[in-house]
Amino acid sequence: MMNYMGYNAGNMGNHDVEAGHAVFDRWIKQCDFPILGANIIRTSDRETYLKPYEVFERDGVKIVVLGMITPAIPVWLPETLWQGLYFADMEETARKWMKIIQEKEKPDVVVGIFHAGGSYHVRPVP
């Protein structure tokens, strides 16, 4: 549906994670657009699991889209669904990536697509 609608970028949500790695990894590969996740970190090497952001140019305007998911996934869902991943704090992640984006990309506009809920408690980085 999202391909049909012509999405340019998307991000993960907790309901995507609920299906488990096999399903969300397949969904990501089936998308004709990048699924972003600046705060989804692989525990094996501490690199981002998904692309953190995507750059677009429209009518001479440079646009960066930054995507993140709630870091409450470990509180809401069993680890068997997201094993090997860590969900970093959104504010810290935004600050980190905004610095990189501003220095490297020099965008005219930054759009954040964030899937988040209410309050949560985050586990420390393993």
PLM region descriptions:
Residues M1-P126:
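Acidic, metal/ion-coordinating pockets
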